[in-house]
């Protein structure tokens, strides 16, 4: 495939790594999203990026945005993705009344969360972490199908600390083990993000809206309790563990979330949230385990 096959239409935005355009495949008439990654002229394309991206082309699943092709020219890399017209952040923002956040109806929350976990379970089975899950990366079709976008890009290009784009690197969905400098993270970092996203779909507002690493941890410990060697063996040896963290007890999640929700919250969804938001990464559910949670029984029993 060459870039001449595509007609570049309007710019959709600047991401962390790339400028994104809507494009048209001239031969098929199908819309695509073109992500253009500028390459450093001296360094050329990092071979790891090419490797990671070719892995992504193999990820074919209903809940993962398809990467159709990669066009490699001298000074840029163009990733050709399927075009999606909405994302979870925009979708939730469009429902805000005045300035008041509004969560989604619980049956929709469940349907979106199920699809998020389905896509994630598939990636994790293929040994690929997302590393940067957030509502902006969850794309939605008009029929309510949810797909994970930007898969593997964090690994291919590194998560920049200061981005040149309008998109702040968001800490809100980042796991406490990563915030404390753990280098041995695994699929459990994505599970933490899933928990944050689930709570946000329920209430319409981010669960832990921190502005820096320190505040982010404080917000997490305020709600989930402060970890110690009993609840999380090894936590005190993490590089950014601070022995002066204020000791907090876990709050009642149901009581915290219920005021934002019209319908009474099901104990099952609170139980699932606890399973996703375990401070100790070894205690978090896997995506596969989460899909078998009783809250989803209507999906797997039918």
From Swiss-Prot:
GO terms for molecular function: ATP binding; cyclin-dependent protein serine/threonine kinase activity; protein serine kinase activity. InterPro entries: CDK, Kinase-like_dom_sf, Prot_kinase_dom, Protein_kinase_ATP_BS, Ser/Thr_kinase_AS. GO terms for cellular component: cellular bud neck; cytoplasm; nucleus; Pho85-Pho80 CDK-cyclin complex. Its EC number is 2.7.11.22. One of its GO terms (biological process) is regulation of protein localization. Pfam families: Pkinase. It catalyses: L-seryl-[protein] + ATP = O-phospho-L-seryl-[protein] + ADP + H(+); L-threonyl-[protein] + ATP = O-phospho-L-threonyl-[protein] + ADP + H(+). The keyword Endoplasmic reticulum does not apply. It comes from the Eukaryota. PROSITE patterns: PROTEIN_KINASE_ATP (PS00107), PROTEIN_KINASE_DOM (PS50011), PROTEIN_KINASE_ST (PS00108). ATP binds at residues 12-20, 35. The keyword ATP-binding applies. Keywords: ATP-binding, Kinase, Nucleotide-binding, Serine/threonine-protein kinase, Transferase. Residues 6-296 form the Protein kinase domain. When phosphate concentrations are high it phosphorylates the PHO4 transcription factor thus establishing repression. Belongs to the protein kinase superfamily. CMGC Ser/Thr protein kinase family. CDC2/CDKX subfamily. This is Negative regulator of the PHO system. It comes from Candida glabrata (strain ATCC 2001 / BCRC 20586 / JCM 3761 / NBRC 0622 / NRRL Y-65 / CBS 138) (Yeast).
């Amino acid at each position: 495939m060459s870039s001449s096959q595509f007609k570049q239409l309007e710019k959709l935005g600047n991401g962390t790594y790339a400028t994104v355009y809507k494009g048209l495949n001239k031969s098929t008439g199908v819309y695509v999203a073109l992500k253009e990654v500028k390459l450093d002229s001296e360094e050329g394309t990092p071979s790891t990026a090419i490797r990671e991206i070719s892995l992504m082309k193999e990820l074919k699943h209903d809940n993962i945005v398809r990467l159709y092709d990669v066009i490699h020219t001298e000074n840029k890399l163009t990733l050709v993705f399927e075009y999606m017209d909405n994302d979870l952040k925009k979708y939730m923002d469009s429902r805000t009344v005045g300035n008041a956040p509004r969560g989604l109806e619980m049956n929709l929350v469940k349907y979106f969360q199920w699809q998020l976990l389905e896509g994630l379970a598939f990636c994790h089975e293929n040994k690929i972490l997302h590393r940067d899950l957030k509502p902006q990366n969850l794309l939605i079709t008009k029929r309510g199908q949810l797909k994970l976008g930007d898969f593997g890009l964090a690994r291919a290009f590194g998560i920049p600390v200061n981005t040149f784009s309008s998109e702040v690197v968001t800490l809100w969905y980042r796991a406490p083990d990563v915030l404390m400098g753990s280098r041995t993270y695994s699929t459990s970092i994505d599970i933490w993000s899933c928990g944050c996203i689930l709570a946000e779909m329920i209430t319409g507002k981010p669960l832990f809206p921190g502005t820096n690493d320190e505040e982010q941890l404080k917000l997490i410990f305020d709600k989930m309790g402060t970890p110690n060697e009993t609840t999380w063996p090894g936590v005190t040896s993490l590089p950014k563990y601070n022995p002066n963290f204020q000791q907090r007890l876990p709050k009642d999640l149901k009581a915290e979330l219920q005021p934002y929700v019209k319908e009474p919250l099901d104990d099952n969804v609170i139980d699932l949230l606890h399973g996703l938001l375990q401070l100790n990464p070894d205690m978090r559910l896997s995506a596969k385990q989460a899909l078998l949670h009783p809250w989803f029984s209507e999906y797997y029993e039918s």
